[in-house]
């Protein structure tokens, strides 16, 4: 089945053929305490750690996480590296060593000056997911019962917003 893009000013209707092989691989968030962040993204949201890379000379570590849904992830380092950088929808957490003990915070983009906004997870049952998040003590930025219907926002340990949606509830979203 071919994909027909929505028509909007600025959209290229026929991208170069070579781009058909491109993959949106990952987005990166800076984190202060990798233990807290890894716990949040693995225990609360179910992501798996694909790869950790340490850079002694730069004093930072990278953690690559994804939803694997039972996929076989290669054990061999070179194969795992290719798997990590060849798949879609990876979250990279970057930890600059020593940042966990300083008083500064990373800017989440949702206060002035605005910029980055959020990442999003789709869940099969929005109400059940939100009840589970409450039980786990997750911070809600926007609970289900406030504002726009059928969407919730939680925040991770660094204050980044995570949107939670249920695809089957959003067919009419944005249709006036």
UniProtKB/Swiss-Prot annotation:
Top enzyme class: lyase
Matches recorded under InterPro entries: Glyas_Bleomycin-R_OHBP_Dase, Glyas_Fos-R_dOase_dom, Glyoxalase_1, Glyoxalase_1_CS, VOC
Swiss-Prot/TrEMBL catalytic activity: (R)-S-lactoylglutathione = methylglyoxal + glutathione
Keyword Signal in record: no
Residue numbers annotated as active site: 163 (proton donor/acceptor)
Pathway assigned in UniProt: Secondary metabolite metabolism; methylglyoxal degradation; (R)-lactate from methylglyoxal: step 1/2
SUPFAM superfamilies in the record: Glyoxalase/Bleomycin resistance protein/Dihydroxybiphenyl dioxygenase (SSF54593)
Cofactor(s) needed for function: Ni(2+); Zn(2+)
Binding positions (Ni(2+)): 26, 92, 118, 163
GO molecular function annotations of the record: lactoylglutathione lyase activity; zinc ion binding
CDD domains, alphabetized: GlxI_Zn (cd07233)
GO BP term, example: methylglyoxal catabolic process to D-lactate via S-lactoyl-glutathione
Xref: Pfam families: Glyoxalase (PF00903)
Binding, substrate: 30, 96, 114, 118
Free-text remark on how the cofactor is bound: Binds 1 nickel or zinc ion per subunit.
Residue span(s) of domain VOC: 23-167
Enzyme Commission number, as recorded: 4.4.1.5
Keyword Zinc: yes
Gene3D superfamilies, alphabetized: 2,3-Dihydroxybiphenyl 1,2-Dioxygenase, domain 1
Family note: Belongs to the glyoxalase I family.
The protein's role, per its UniProt record: Catalyzes the conversion of hemimercaptal, formed from methylglyoxal and glutathione, to S-lactoylglutathione.
Subunit structure as annotated in this protein's UniProt entry: Monomer.
PANTHER family xrefs: LACTOYLGLUTATHIONE LYASE, LACTOYLGLUTATHIONE LYASE GLYOXALASE I
Entry protein name: Lactoylglutathione lyase
Organism of this sequence: Pseudomonas aeruginosa (strain ATCC 15692 / DSM 22644 / CIP 104116 / JCM 14847 / LMG 12228 / 1C / PRS 101 / PAO1)
Lineage: Bacteria, Pseudomonadati, Pseudomonadota, Gammaproteobacteria, Pseudomonadales
């Amino acid at each position: 089945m071919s994909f027909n893009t929505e028509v909007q000013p600025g959209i290229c209707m026929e991208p170069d053929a070579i781009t058909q092989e491109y993959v949106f691989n990952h987005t990166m968030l800076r984190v202060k305490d990798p233990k807290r962040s890894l716990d949040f993204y693995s225990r609360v949201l179910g992501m798996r750690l694909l790869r950790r890379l340490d850079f002694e000379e730069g004093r930072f570590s990278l953690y690559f996480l994804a939803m694997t849904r039972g996929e076989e992830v290669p054990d061999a380092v070179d194969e795992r590296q290719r798997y990590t950088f060849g798949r879609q929808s990876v979250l990279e957490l970057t930890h600059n060593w020593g940042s966990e003990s300083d008083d500064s915070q990373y800017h989440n983009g949702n206060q002035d000056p605005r910029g980055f906004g959020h990442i999003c997870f789709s869940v099969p049952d929005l109400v059940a997911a939100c009840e589970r998040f409450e039980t786990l003590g997750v911070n809600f930025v926007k609970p289900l019962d406030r504002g726009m219907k059928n969407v919730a926002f939680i925040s991770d340990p660094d204050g980044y917003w995570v949107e939670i949606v249920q695809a089957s509830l959003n067919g009419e979203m944005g249709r006036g």
